[in-house]
Regions:
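WD40-repeat beta-propellers
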Residues: 1-2, 23, 43-48, 76, ...
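Beta-propeller domains
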Residues: 1-12, 50-51
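WD40/WD-repeat beta-propeller blade-loop signature
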Residues: 9, 19, 30-33, 62, ...
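WD40/WD-repeat beta-propeller blade N-cap
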Residues: 13-20, 66-73, 112-119, 125-126, ...
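Loop/turn segments within WD40 beta-propeller blades
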Residues: 24-31, 77-84, 123-139, 180-189, ...
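Conserved strand-to-loop turn within each blade of WD40 beta-propeller repeats
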Residues: 36-40, 48, 89-93, 101, ...
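Solenoidal tandem-repeat scaffolds enriched in leucines and small polar residues
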Residues: 56-157
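Terminal intrinsically disordered, low-complexity extensions flanking WD-repeat/beta-propeller proteins
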Residues: 130, 177, 183, 187-190, ...
């Protein structure tokens, strides 16, 4: 196979009535399952049921239509597979819905009124970073971000049988565009990155699940009065698989990579300028 050559014919999954903002694969232990989120306010869950495993064989079926939102669904994220087949959906209607596939084949839905004015992003905390001691029950936590400039942390409460807000992170001054928990491989604490319309990226750390969050801004600016400011809106943040390098995507067409040094400071180790056609 030559570089860039298609593996198969491919297949177009049709059904949404507006732009599709995001797609997300479920963990392979649940099968070949793909979720899609759209401006039409719907989330579709698709499953490839072909016997030979080919993605382009016409074996895709839409197994769930999630249409409870009244505005665009902007982001989706599957929970850690240890928590089951669970999908969080963030919408411009201000709500976050959590879809869970049950053992009897049914789907259950939890709705959370998260952010007045709209929710832009959602991210699940890795399971291993939320366990305080061996044998302790797995904590089910996620972070959401939206138009209120606030990042909220939620936890599923067995006592109340619903998701409850346990923390608010309030350092941003404008819409929070993205939020991302770092993978927990080899990390001593929990890391959470947030990106905002205010042109800043903040790194939040928590030593244990009950400790307060500590905030450290990235420092991309050359001028002392603008040290925390990127050149434009920061749209996305994404962690490396090992969780020690953060990619930052900015509105000026640049992607920068950041890494924490031994002193606990974050340094830009690389920068890529996207070509303009």
């Amino acid at each position: 196979m030559q570089k860039g050559e298609a593996v198969g014919a491919g297949e177009t999954l049709v059904g949404h009535e507006g732009p599709v903002w995001q797609v997300a694969w479920a963990h392979p232990s649940f099968g070949t399952i793909l979720a899609s989120a759209s401006y039409d306010g719907k989330v579709f869950i698709w499953k490839n049921e072909s016997t030979n495993g080919s993605y382009g064989s016409g074996g895709w079926a839409r197994i769930k239509d999630h249409a409870l939102h009244t505005a665009s669904v902007n982001a989706i994220a599957w929970a850690p597979h240890e928590l089951g087949a669970t999908l969080a959906c963030a919408s411009s209607d201000g709500r976050v819905s959590v879809l869970t596939f049950n053992e009897d084949g049914s789907w259950s839905v939890d709705l959370v009124a998260a952010h007045p004015g709209g929710c832009h992003a959602v991210s699940w905390m890795p399971v291993s970073t939320a366990t305080t001691e061996p044998g302790a029950p797995m904590m089910c936590r996620l972070a959401t971000a939206g138009c209120d400039a606030v990042v909220k942390i939620w936890e599923f409460s067995e006592e109340h049988n619903r998701y409850v807000e346990i923390d608010q992170l309030k350092q941003h001054r404008d819409w929070v565009r993205d939020v991302a928990f770092a993978p927990s491989l080899g990390l001593a604490r929990t890391y959470l990155a947030t990106a905002s319309q205010d042109r800043t990226v903040l790194i939040w750390t928590q030593d244990t699940p009950n400790d307060p969050w500590k905030c450290t801004p990235l420092l991309p600016g050359a001028k002392p009065e603008d040290r925390t400011k990127f050149a434009d809106t920061v749209w996305r943040v994404s962690w490396s698989v090992s969780g020690n390098v953060l990619a930052v995507s900015c509105g000026d067409g640049k992607v920068s990579l950041w890494k924490e040094n031994l002193k606990g400071d974050w340094e830009c180790i690389s920068e890529y300028v996207c070509p303009v056609n």
